[in-house]
Curated annotation (Swiss-Prot):
It is a peripheral membrane protein. Could be involved in insertion of integral membrane proteins into the membrane. It comes from the Bacteria. It is found in: Cell inner membrane. One of its GO terms (cellular component) is plasma membrane. Its main location: membrane. Keywords: Cell inner membrane, Cell membrane, Membrane. This is Putative membrane protein insertion efficiency factor. NCBIfam families: membrane protein insertion efficiency factor YidD. Belongs to the UPF0161 family.
């Protein structure tokens, strides 16, 4: 039961990221300061760590993506 709930939540998060990539990102243009981009990071983090830890890692990454932090390579941590 827990695995099904986690799968549903993962799919919801991934759908939100796909929506952002398809509809919002083209309007805003490239703005991410990191490699991989924040949306790529989010997909990888959720696929690698699941919806809870992956979502938390993605949220922390989004908060770091601003002009006050240095840019560059910032991969998803291993398990």
């Amino acid at each position: 039961m827990i695995k099904k709930i986690n799968a549903v939540i993962s799919n919801l998060f991934l759908t939100l990221i796909r929506f952002y990539r398809s509809w919002i990102s083209p309007l805003l243009g490239p703005s991410c300061r990191f490699v991989p981009t924040c949306s790529e990071y989010g997909v990888e983090a959720i696929e690698k760590h699941g919806p809870w830890k992956g979502g938390w890692l993605t949220l922390k990454r989004l908060l770091r993506c601003n002009p006050l932090t240095p840019c560059g390579y910032d991969p998803v941590p291993d398990k």
